Amino acid sequence: MSGVDQIVKKFANLGEGDREAAMKAFLAMMPVSNEPVAEPVRKAPTAKKKVNGFMGFRSNYSPLFSYLPQKMRSPFMTILWQYDPYHNEWDFMCSVYSSIRTDLEEQNVTLQLWIHYAIGQMGLIDRDHYMASFGWRLGQTRNGTTDLFRTAIPMVRRNLQPMNGLCLLIKCLESGLSKHLTNPHPIIAKLQDPSFDMIWINKPPHHQQGHTDQADNSELGMPSLFPGNHAVAAEVDGIANLPLSHRTQQGDFGTEPGFSTQFDTMLDSILENGNHPSNSHYNMSLAMDLPMTG
């Protein structure tokens, strides 16, 4: 019998009082450490995964197929997402949600509830009308299985949408989200911080490219803002050929960059014509970023 077994057997045969005395004797023989006991290190909460557009899309529309098995729902959701024209809008909504997710969850606002209010502000189709609006239907194939069919491809329209995350949040609060939040002010304050907010360009991609081209090429930009016979358009007819800068003598302080006389004259004329009352139609269009006629 080993020494350990003998000790255990002997300890088991001791009376209750003797056992306690034996335990104290064992503890007294153990070495005492003067080193402080390290406190357990608390792990920082793991950052939650950012919600992307498809995750939000699936969360909102997957109940359309709730009566089908999972192996059928997933492919159908992938097909709907593939042909959905609002990927940018979904990415924007979910980016805003991700930036304030912790604050919303603390007040029991789920992703589904956020989307319920956000899609109306983004001009997206609600769940009950989605399939019919985009020409989708479920039907039976020849072998009797259920499949997804598209019978029509409708025109897509986009409404004027919120310009940033704070604007989207405010519109959601106004449309009813506020009744689910006991204190929305910290969330509003967070989105007022540019490091948390994000900007949304509320135009289709081909319109965005058009603005880029106009900004890079003034000869494209002016005809898009004013009719061909307008005084302002005539002023910039040869802007690409003007010398834009020169060096002006500044006495003892050397030279500094400036604009050429030709360019200064042209700019003054543009501003004078542009501020004329007859141009209010164009000034308003510029301010509102709307297409113009005339």
UniProtKB/Swiss-Prot annotation:
DNA-binding region listed in the record: 46-101
GO cellular component: a single term: nucleus
Stored InterPro entries: MATalpha_HMGbox (IPR006856)
Compartments in which it is found: Nucleus
Pfam families noted in UniProt: MATalpha_HMGbox
Keyword Transcription regulation: yes
GO function terms (MF aspect): DNA binding, bending
Organism: Sordaria equina
Upper lineage: Eukaryota, Fungi, Dikarya, Ascomycota, Pezizomycotina
The family this protein is said to belong to: Belongs to the MATALPHA1 family.
Function, as annotated: Mating type proteins are sequence specific DNA-binding proteins that act as master switches in fungal differentiation by controlling gene expression in a cell type-specific fashion. Transcriptional activator that induces the transcription of alpha-specific genes.
Protein name: Mating type protein mtA-1
Keywords per UniProt: DNA-binding, Nucleus, Transcription, Transcription regulation
The keyword Transcription belongs to this UniProt entry's keyword annotation: yes
Gene Ontology terms describing biological process: positive regulation of mating-type specific transcription, DNA-templated
